[in-house]
Amino acid sequence: MAQAWAFLLPVLFFGSYVTNLFLPTYASSPLCSGDGGRSFLCAQAPKDKDPSPASTMYKTAFHFQSAKNWMNDPSGPMYFNGIYHEFYQYNLNGPIFGDIVWGHSVSTDLINWIGLGPALVRDTSSDIDGCWTGSVTILPGGKPVIIYTGGDIDQHQVQNIAFPKNRSDPYLREWIKAANNPVLRPDEPGMNSIEFRDPTTGWIGPDGLWRMAVGGELNGYSAALLYKSEDFLNWTKVDHPLYSHNGSNMWECPDFFAVLPGNNGGLDLSAAIPQGAKHALKMSVDSVDKYLIGVYDLKRDAFVPDNVIDDRRLWLRIDYGTFYASKSFFDSNKGRRIIWGWSRETDSPSDDLEKGWAGLHTIPRRIWLADDGKQLLQWPVDEIEFLRTNEINHQGLELNKGDLFEIKEVDTFQADVEIDFELASIDDADPFDPSWLLDPEKHCGEVGASVPGGIGPFGLVILASDNMEEHTEVYFRVYKLQEKYMVLMCSDLRRSSMRPDLEKPAYGGFFEFDLAKERKISLRTLIDRSAVESFGGGGRVCITSRVYPAVLADVGRAHMYAFNNGSATVRVPQLSAWTMRKAQVNVEKGWSAIQNRGSI
């Protein structure tokens, strides 16, 4: 094992990194679309040009992406009549935000996708400014209905409904908008007309009425506004929100679903919820997706969190990296709840114009409640494993302080890696400072993989160049707080690329782990060129990262290592890695390709 820790010398981090989803403003140019200013941005990429090297170098092989142009939020995913549907926010005209419609793709396995034409376009007075995020609810009798936010002619946010034009069409390619759109307007006292969007999937209450929540601002509070309906067409606002909070920005993309402790399956909101079930309320805020666990009080018609936490920095997160606007759905095919999110580009708008595309969706994940009922766990859907090939295995490795073990014989730029780290001793854990919970990213940046600890850092180095000038580190550190153990998981991108014009933070999150009972900490990392998704501790912390290393231009040169830089020895009882084959994603090749997994 090489002793090559010079590559992990401390990195000076110039300037401050600020996670920000506000998109840049473009000046007028000959590329403007001339739509009367309805687009948020007007610059568009030249059409029909040859793909740039960056377009092919950074484009993923098995993540959900549009063939070209801008995409953002997942909207209205569902399983219907044997087919998975993924709708998404999409710009038909270029790789920047604007002119938003609902893209539409279909699949039989959640991995290979056929792109169809747009399901919804902005062609009425209630959505002329954009067909924005929404959900699908399947009504009794197997009738799917879309409810979505539209930007109306006055640039107010309103809620609209659409139905399939022909339910006998297995792909539901055409949708008809309801004649009474918009079905909801932000016209009640205390509502903000430009902060009223992203309706949830509907559910039926004990009184037999439909309910749904819409993200909004009410009297200056962030809220999941609650509405009722008998027929899903005519809605009445309930006099109190499902839940609200006075200490955060407007909640985008709320999601509300039932979970059952000790059950890693999903629960269908349109069916009776079993005794003992809890509910999760997710909101997209502060550029991340956060959530609370609690109960749905049927008498009060309100969500009641198990723990009321005023400081939203302490709210749990779905993902601690570049992940936003997630949407879940109940998969009746396999009795599970699936969630995925939007991972934006972290390069520059000019890069996106050169690439001709921007944005992707994370790998679909199963999501369920941990046995202790305190947090959600996530794991990639099993279907992704159909892309695995060329498996390599190592058992019985031992990593002492400063050790690197190179993982060879897989395509390290397009791989799935599962590794168990077993701690020889837990006596050397450094003390934990609870204030670190307020900003785990800051702590990851302060300690880094080059700073030895009692237990850790240990983990993976991925997408590393020959001289280690470029590399990304995904690793753990173990701390002790009284009789508990806290594990820090980091995905450090600060040396992921030599380019200076990128966002290169050190992402991180903490999870509590009973090391006295279980000495193994698992790590799974999916590497797909510019997208890296990591799952720590069985899905207790998930981190999505976007990276743009030059080493991807010569993919055979990318290296991957298991490492330990802590004082305590770490054993690796099992390390498995696979090369991942390319999926068919939004490329028209006919249905035979996705019906026969052997052809992918």
Swiss-Prot record:
Record's function text: Hydrolyzes inulin-type beta-(2,1)-fructans. May play a role as a beta-(2,1)-trimmer during graminan biosynthesis.
Signal peptide (residue range): 1-27
UniProt-listed Enzyme Commission number(s): 3.2.1.153
Record organism: Leymus chinensis (Chinese lyme grass)
Keyword entries, A-Z: Disulfide bond, Glycoprotein, Glycosidase, Hydrolase, Signal
UniProt-listed InterPro entries: ConA-like_dom_sf, Fructan_Metab_Enzymes, Glyco_hydro_32, Glyco_hydro_32_C, Glyco_hydro_32_N, Glyco_hydro_beta-prop_sf
Highest taxon, organism lineage: Eukaryota
Name of the featured protein: Fructan 1-exohydrolase
Catalytic activity: Hydrolysis of terminal, non-reducing (2->1)-linked beta-D-fructofuranose residues in fructans
Active site: 73
One protein family per Pfam: Glyco_hydro_32C
SMART domains per record: Glyco_32
Regulation of its activity: Inhibited by sucrose.
Residues with attached carbohydrate: 166, 234, 246, 565
PANTHER family: BETA-FRUCTOFURANOSIDASE, INSOLUBLE ISOENZYME CWINV1-RELATED
